[in-house]
A protein has these predicted regions:
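Conserved N-terminal entry element of GNAT/NAT acetyltransferase domains
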Residues: 1-13, 155-164
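Short hydrophobic/aromatic beta-strand or adjacent loop that forms the aromatic wall/cage
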Residues: 49, 143-149
Length: 164
């Protein structure tokens, strides 16, 4: 396919690039700055956490993370598939799917039984990837309704089976 996926923990120089994408794509007034997001990406993990970057022909074009916390309204749920982003010029090539599968494989290898995510735009993508709708929630930071989704990971293959 012409792409590879690397962990930010193995390539810390990618943290500012990922931080800029995340702040641009998911930021909100009064939210984290690029510098704060970079520091968060480089901070020691809380449980099984990792951020991945997908390279297309050697160029970083997308990211996704396994995060301990994500949706403020649901601190009881953990961990989360978070920050799934692919640069617009590289969408439609299966990159988001590859990133989601990489995070799922990482989580499964860490014996995570269930993952959570929330989205306001990509429910069809996640539904195609066997995520199921778990309800509606309010994203308090952005003041919008979001779809809460979940995926049971028991029985998934190891990370090496997902082409990383």
């Amino acid at each position: 396919m012409g792409f590879e996926i690397a962990a930010v923990s193995d390539r810390p120089e990618l943290a500012p690039v990922v931080a800029a994408w995340l702040v641009d794509a998911f930021g909100y007034p009064g939210g984290r700055t690029v510098e704060e997001m970079t520091a968060l990406l480089l901070a020691p993990p809380v449980g099984p956490e990792e951020t991945f970057v997908l390279f297309d022909q050697g160029v970083p074009v997308g990211t996704a993370s396994l995060a301990h916390r994500d949706l403020e309204a649901r601190p009881d749920l953990t961990p989360w598939l978070a920050g799934v982003f692919v640069q617009p010029a590289f969408r439609g090539r299966g990159h988001a799917t590859a990133l989601v599968r990489r995070v799922e494989a990482f989580a499964a290898a860490a014996s995570v039984p269930v993952l959570w995510l929330y989205t306001w735009t990509a429910e069809p993508l996640y539904a195609r990837l066997a995520w199921r709708r778990a309800g509606l929630e309010t994203d308090q930071k952005r003041g919008r309704e979001v779809v809460l989704m979940t995926r049971r990971l028991s029985g998934l293959c190891q990370a090496s089976d997902f082409g990383h």
